[in-house]
Amino acid sequence: MSTEVRLTQYSHGAGCGCKISPKVLETILHSEQEKFLDPHLLVGNETRDDAAVYDIGNGTGIISTTDFFMPIVDDPFDFGRIAATNAISDIYAMGGKPIMAIAILGWPIDKLAPEIARKVIEGGRAACKEAGIVLAGGHSIDAPEPIFGLAVTGIVNIDRVKQNSAAKVGSQLFLTKPLGIGVLTTAEKKGLLLPEHQGIAIETMCRLNKLGMDFAEVAGITAMTDVTGFGLLGHLSEICAGSGVQATLHFAKVPKLPEVESYIAKGCVPGGTGRNFDSYGHLIGEMTELQRKLLCDPQTSGGLLLAVLPEAMDEVKAIARCHGIELTAIGELSEQQSGRVLIEVNE
């Protein structure tokens, strides 16, 4: 769908790249105030997981999450689809099934027509329909910049919850979507994106991570998270810190969007990349400039990052193949050693 309005001109950030940096977020969330503890809350924010999980009895957990951001593309319908797909992904990343969503909309009503906002909502509704859920309501405010996202509710068998803090030594790492979304969308804004690469990032961002529901059945997947605004290294460092392991990443094996290296060489690097490295670069071993700029690239609606025990690798690859995805191990986890960085990157 084409539009005369370029939504990205009305926002200072783009997609998950407009997230508050991990370093600043740590300051915001740190509190000396005594926390209210609820024994039924199985997953909270202690390990920066993708969603909260609450035990409602009978072996069932309710998953609750929210995600919203400013436009990463100009087309309002695509913006709505991408934002909704990204929000729903958190449910899949926990191994859950989404059941309902409500919309979050901020709109500069003095700058952008309400008809454009309607197209954004329609895009969000389309993504919800593809996920098999209803967009049941929402809340809107007059805001200086366009913002859209969802609060999503899901369900999960509490014995099958996948967390980012339970990875085991010896697990192999897999990523279900290629990296470079931030790079390609930046290239498009700069007018440098080649015609043959038009739409690739949008297609990737709009692909639901439904296979997370199937991965929930695999006991050998010891940790799972989705890769979004903090980049691959940021989310992998959360797995390592929460699980007490360290990782070795093989850069050549990491899936990448077409020609992403050449776009990086042309300066198509979003601002979030530097903020990410500033926040967790001290946890990473030596890298080349190319490795740093791609592995810290903020992803919007990125893929699932899995830690898989060797005996479950064939089953995981078969599940992915049923969803049209060929998986290759991109690294492995080992025992965390004192004084060592959490992640080593090699060629």
From Swiss-Prot:
Keywords: ATP-binding, Kinase, Magnesium, Metal-binding, Nucleotide-binding, Selenium, Transferase. It comes from the Bacteria. SUPFAM superfamilies: PurM C-terminal domain-like (SSF56042), PurM N-terminal domain-like (SSF55326). InterPro entries: PurM-like_C_dom (IPR010918), PurM-like_C_sf (IPR036676), PurM-like_N (IPR016188), PurM-like_N_sf (IPR036921), SelD_I (IPR023061), SPS/SelD (IPR004536). GO terms for molecular function: ATP binding; magnesium ion binding; selenide, water dikinase activity. ATP binds at K19, T47, R48, D49, D67, D90, G138, H139, S140. The record marks K19 as: Important for catalytic activity. Its cofactor is Mg(2+). GO terms for biological process: selenocysteine biosynthetic process. Mg(2+) binds at D50, D90, D226. The active site is at C16. It catalyses: hydrogenselenide + ATP + H2O = selenophosphate + AMP + phosphate + 2 H(+). Pfam families: AIRS, AIRS_C. Binds 1 Mg(2+) ion per monomer. Belongs to the selenophosphate synthase 1 family. Class I subfamily. Synthesizes selenophosphate from selenide and ATP. Homodimer. This is Selenide, water dikinase. It comes from Photorhabdus laumondii subsp. laumondii (strain DSM 15139 / CIP 105565 / TT01) (Photorhabdus luminescens subsp. laumondii). The lineage of its organism: Bacteria, Pseudomonadati, Pseudomonadota, Gammaproteobacteria, Enterobacterales.
